[in-house]
């Protein structure tokens, strides 16, 4: 019992390091180049493609789609962006957030101690605030990877729990069970990047034969889709008390993820086959972290590919769902 409690503490400790590292990285980047990023968001949204690419790039730098979505909502409230400009940026933010999963699948956490050392060194050695911001960002990256390493080392004994194995068996039998598990995980942690990292760590544990994953790709995908749905709650919370357009962009974010998750769940086997086609071959437990990262990127990329040409229709849809006060609802 005591050993199980210690293992749980290790998992939560690793998760805390991951979240703090992500937050430190995001804050350091915002302090260092935040004004330029905000200027980039305001200027580079002339057309939907530019907005998509800008959203993806800014999110990849900040390592937080929630931060970009909240920034977009603030710009809408301030009148710096129009709704038609903001929606593609949110689509791009969903793509940019997949960078973390791809980095973790490359196992670059082996550089974590060097990143931590260089980050602290820069913070101590640099006299100007910009150099210290770079140091804090590098340190945040190192802390992020250290958190993942701690979670991975804790997963092996944790997965010996009969209760957890029973839950994993339920997830494998029911995609809906996995979807709800992913939503609950992200609602609890408030970070889809953290829950995807946790999923990668859990899925990479080998089964009884030492070849297959304990979870499997078709069981991991619904959890991943749930993670993507859960992250829309942050935008909804940020839109509370804001103007009508802020609520509409939060609704567009939710529709983007919900519609994509519904289609992928309905076409689970073909989607899993596409992911395997785009991923390296080998023992399942050795390649599943990459498969999950690729599934994350494919899901958001394909959703953006479908919805980007329909930006106008999305804007009309959210305006119809959330009409201006004292105005009748628009017809779709």
Model regions: which residues?
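Alpha-helical transmembrane segments of multi-pass membrane proteins, especially transporters
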Residues: 15, 35, 39, 43, ...
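Interfacial loop-to-helix junctions that mark the boundaries of transmembrane helices
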Residues: 1-9, 102-111, 165-170, 218-221, ...
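Hydrophobic core segments of alpha-helical transmembrane domains in multi-pass membrane transport
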Residues: 11-23, 55-59, 117-126, 140-150, ...
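Signature of multi-pass transmembrane helix bundles
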Residues: 5, 82-90, 102-152, 168
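Transmembrane alpha-helical segments and their short flanking loops
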Residues: 148, 152-171, 214, 238-332
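Membrane-interfacial helix-loop connectors
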Residues: 59-62, 68-96, 103-111, 119, ...
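Helix-loop-helix hairpins and the membrane-proximal interhelical loops
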Residues: 2-48, 138-184, 202, 212-213
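Membrane-spanning helices that line or support transport/gating and their immediate boundary helices
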Residues: 20, 24-32, 36, 40, ...
């Amino acid at each position: 019992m005591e050993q199980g409690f210690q293992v749980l503490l290790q998992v939560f400790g690793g998760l805390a390091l991951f979240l703090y590292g992500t937050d430190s990285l995001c804050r350091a980047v915002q302090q260092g180049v935040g004004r330029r990023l905000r200027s980039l968001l305001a200027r580079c949204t002339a057309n939907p493609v530019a907005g998509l690419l800008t959203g993806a790039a800014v999110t990849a730098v900040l390592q937080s789609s929630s931060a970009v979505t909240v920034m977009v909502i603030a710009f809408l409230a301030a009148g710096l962006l129009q709704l038609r400009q903001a929606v593609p940026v949110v689509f791009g933010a969903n793509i940019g957030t997949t960078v973390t999963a791809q980095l973790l699948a490359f196992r670059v956490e082996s550089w974590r101690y060097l990143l931590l050392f260089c980050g602290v060194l820069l913070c101590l050695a640099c006299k100007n605030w910009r150099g210290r911001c770079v140091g804090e960002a590098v340190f945040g990256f190192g802390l992020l990877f250290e958190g993942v390493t701690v979670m991975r080392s804790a997963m092996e004994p944790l997965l010996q729990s009969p209760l957890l194995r029973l839950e994993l068996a339920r997830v494998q039998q029911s995609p809906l069970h996995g979807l709800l598990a992913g939503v609950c995980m992200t609602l609890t942690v408030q970070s889809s990047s953290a829950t995807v990292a946790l999923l990668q760590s859990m899925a990479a544990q080998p089964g009884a034969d030492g070849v297959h994953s304990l979870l499997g790709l078709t069981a991991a995908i619904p959890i991943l889709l749930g993670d993507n749905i859960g992250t829309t709650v942050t935008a909804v919370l940020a839109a509370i008390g804001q103007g009508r357009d802020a609520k509409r962009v939060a609704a567009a974010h939710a529709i983007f993820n919900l519609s994509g998750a519904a289609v992928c769940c309905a076409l689970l086997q073909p989607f899993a086959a596409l992911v395997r086609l785009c991923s390296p071959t080998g023992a399942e437990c050795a390649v599943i972290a990459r498969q999950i990262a690729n599934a994350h990127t494919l899901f958001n990329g394909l959703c953006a590919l479908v919805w980007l040409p329909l930006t106008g229709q999305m804007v009309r849809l959210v305006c119809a769902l959330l009409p201006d006060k004292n105005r009748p609802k628009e017809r779709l």
